[in-house]
């Protein structure tokens, strides 16, 4: 894109959302590393530590993993089996991409639904994770992340379907 062309509103919004996602991921990762390092120093230097630090670090691992999965799903950057790329003809590869993306979207939708049910149960239960932070709040990333991933893969499957239709003779 040359510098005289203007990006559309949706392209600018998408770019901003990607930057927000990246910033959240970096912030979570830095917080996780900072908390772990702080805990190590406190234990080794003062023989004391933050009581809820280990629990927070475990929760941050969950959040970093799921936000990282959201980031990876932007362009369909997931674990793939390269055998399809090597041996399938171009049209068959497009069909395989569509099937994989649609299947991924459906599975993520199911996981999002059942994780939402789980978070609702945790909300009803009222348990605390640490320092008066409720369990459900720590687990809320699960349905959110899988919903975002499902939506992205539904969009990717629509794009792949259009490519299949356009490439037909």
Task: Please report, for each region that a protein language model flagged, where it lies by residue.
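Alpha-helical transmembrane segments and membrane-interface helix-loop junctions
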Residues: 1-169
